[in-house]
């Protein structure tokens, strides 16, 4: 049975439409700037069809960056109904370390703010190849430190601080959590990594199996890692799968699709977290490809994926709002 035949039927149609419009998918676009433009346009069209997120306030702010010559842009999301203390979430967008922005995942961050009733900060980290590692994780860690130090002004409880990201954002969430552990600040109460990009070696069976889905596959992943590392060897902050010691990380939620090339590295990482004594919840979704819940939001599988995520965040952050 081919990979395409194993895709959840309701999640397959949007993928087929994408490949009809763009043969070969995103990976067929050689120029990185053109690829970014195409993906940004597609995401704008996709999010325009989603229901609006109400009852939140959004503010962009510049903060000091690790490089004193630069500033980081963070986008702050606050519920309009402020009552008591709220949890805090640092949200890290995906895009293979080479694409994406706070704008491309604005709807996700806003949805988390409204649904969890959380203060959410999304960080506009620098992208490769223009800025190779460690720029990305440095920016994310700087945003996490800033967020924690400004908790009172932002309006969240530092004892309920989580980090959330998907794909490259999931890898950066884990890397940032590793850095926070090593620097002993700030203390994270939870990390959620959705199909995280964490292993530069591309040696797992799934990394060799998923080669032509069109969303994110082996060729795209190898190319992105090459750009991200910029010719240097990967350390644990670049590729968390290389970390030898996973103890001391916060309770963790990982999910990944059966047909995602990150499947095996994510399953192995979850196993190692458990062996290191880290409370870990793992979900592997049959029929799901990389980011399928974003491309097919109306599919029942996508709704199931989001329900599990929201439930986990509410449990971890001790909130009592309705799931969706």
Task: List each model region and its residues.
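Alpha/beta-hydrolase active-site loop
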Residues: 131-153, 309
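Hydrolase active-site cap/lid region
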Residues: 178-233
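Catalytic active-site module of serine/aspartate enzymes centered on a nucleophile-bearing elbow/loop
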Residues: 299-324
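Short beta-strand/loop motif that positions the catalytic acidic residue
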Residues: 254-256
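A glycine/proline-hinged amphipathic helix-loop "lid/cap" segment
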Residues: 1-76, 318-324
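Short amphipathic alpha-helix adjacent to the substrate-entry channel of hydrolases
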Residues: 103-122
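Proline/glycine-enriched tight loop/beta-turn segments at coil->beta junctions
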Residues: 69-72, 79-88, 247-249
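Gly/Ser-rich "nucleophile elbow"/oxyanion-hole loop immediately N-terminal to the catalytic nucleophile
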Residues: 148-163, 183
């Amino acid at each position: 049975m081919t990979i395409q035949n194993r895709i959840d039927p309701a999640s397959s149609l949007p993928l087929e439409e994408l490949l009809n419009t763009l043969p070969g998918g995103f990976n067929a676009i050689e120029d990185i700037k053109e690829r970014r433009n195409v993906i940004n346009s597609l995401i704008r069209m996709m999010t325009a069809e989603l229901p609006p997120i109400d009852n939140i306030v959004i503010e962009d702010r510049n903060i000091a960056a690790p490089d004193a010559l630069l500033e980081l842009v963070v986008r702050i999301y606050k519920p309009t109904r402020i009552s008591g203390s709220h949890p805090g979430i640092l949200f890290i967008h995906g895009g293979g370390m080479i694409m994406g922005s706070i704008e491309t995942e604005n709807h996700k961050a806003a949805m988390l703010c409204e649904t969890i009733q959380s203060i959410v900060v999304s960080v506009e980290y620098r992208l490769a190849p223009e800025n190779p590692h460690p720029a990305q994780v440095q920016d994310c860690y700087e945003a996490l430190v800033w967020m924690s130090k400004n908790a009172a002004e932002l309006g969240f409880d530092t004892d309920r601080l989580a980090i959330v990201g998907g794909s490259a954002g999931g890898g950066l969430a884990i890397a940032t959590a590793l850095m926070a552990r090593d620097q002993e600040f700030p203390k994270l109460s939870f990390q959620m990594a959705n199909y995280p990009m964490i292993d530069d070696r591309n040696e797992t069976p799934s990394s060799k199996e998923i080669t032509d889905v069109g969303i994110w596959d082996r060729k795209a992943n190898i190319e992105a890692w090459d750009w991200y590392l910029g010719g240097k060897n990967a350390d644990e902050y670049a590729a968390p799968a290389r970390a030898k010691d996973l103890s001391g990380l916060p309770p963790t939620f990982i999910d990944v699709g059966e047909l995602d090339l990150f499947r095996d590295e994510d399953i192995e990482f979850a196993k190692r977290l458990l062996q290191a004594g880290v409370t870990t919840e793992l979900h592997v979704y049959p029929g799901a490809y990389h980011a399928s819940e974003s491309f097919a939001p109306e599919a029942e599988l996508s709704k199931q994926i989001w329900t599990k995520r929201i439930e986990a965040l509410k449990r971890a952050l001790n909130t009592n709002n309705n799931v969706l």
